[in-house]
Amino acid sequence: MIVIPAIDLKNGQCVRLRQGLMEDTTVFSDSPVEMAEQWVKQGARRVHLVDLNGAFEGRPVNVSSVTEVVSAFPDLPVQIGGGIRNMQIANAYIEAGIDYLIIGTMAVTNPEFVSELCREFPSKVIVGLDANDGLVATQGWTQQTDLNVVNLSKKFEQYGVSSIVYTDIARDGMMQGVNIEATVDLAKQTSIPIIASGGISNMEDIFGLLVEAHHGIMGAIIGRAIYEGTLDFKQAQQFCDAN
């Protein structure tokens, strides 16, 4: 299981939101490249970038910050989400050197877009499913649907999606611990590898996920915990490697 540091971008800065609320923002750095360098030095094998402005506006906004990170670390796999709503945007990111495209809202509202992307960019497409009590939310979490996250994930198995980033909205940015039960339940019911996200706050959460990783949990995205110091990133990755 790999530990993936999250770098959330808002107006060119590295920030964290609480429960996806743009008005509840904490700024951690003015330099995404320096932040990425910090995690690379500690052994990061992939970074998770989110264009928060893009997620809310439906188009890429922090493109320059994203491309700076990719250029600075050409050997570092990068996954990007937020505002990827058409093939033109997806193609631009792939050409810029992005390794994985995370499709959130469009995966829910237009699943055929995911199918098209998988055909165009095999093994480079990740679906981001954000759920509240097992029901999917979209549009930067502002729109709640009545779609069951497990049922929706099964739809993507036939497309060749490389993984699913599963975020429990109620836990995200709240440092309350990851929803292991819901994450494992999803992993058991789909053949697509799961990347856990939302609420991971300490080594206990990492251990809890690692114990269940054999069900298909391939990674864990960590945000606020590594910025506020409740989780040591290097220690977490070394622990996963040793077990």
Curated annotation (Swiss-Prot):
Top-rank taxon of the source lineage equals: Bacteria
Provide the E.C. number(s) assigned to this enzyme.
5.3.1.16
Main localization of the protein described in the UniProt heading: cytoplasm
Its catalytic activity? 1-(5-phospho-beta-D-ribosyl)-5-[(5-phospho-beta-D-ribosylamino)methylideneamino]imidazole-4-carboxamide = 5-[(5-phospho-1-deoxy-D-ribulos-1-ylimino)methylamino]-1-(5-phospho-beta-D-ribosyl)imidazole-4-carboxamide
Q: Which GO terms describe its biological process?
A: L-histidine biosynthetic process; L-tryptophan biosynthetic process
Active-site annotation: 8, 130
Q: What is this protein called?
A: 1-(5-phosphoribosyl)-5-[(5-phosphoribosylamino)methylideneamino] imidazole-4-carboxamide isomerase
Q: Which organism is it from?
A: Ruthia magnifica subsp. Calyptogena magnifica
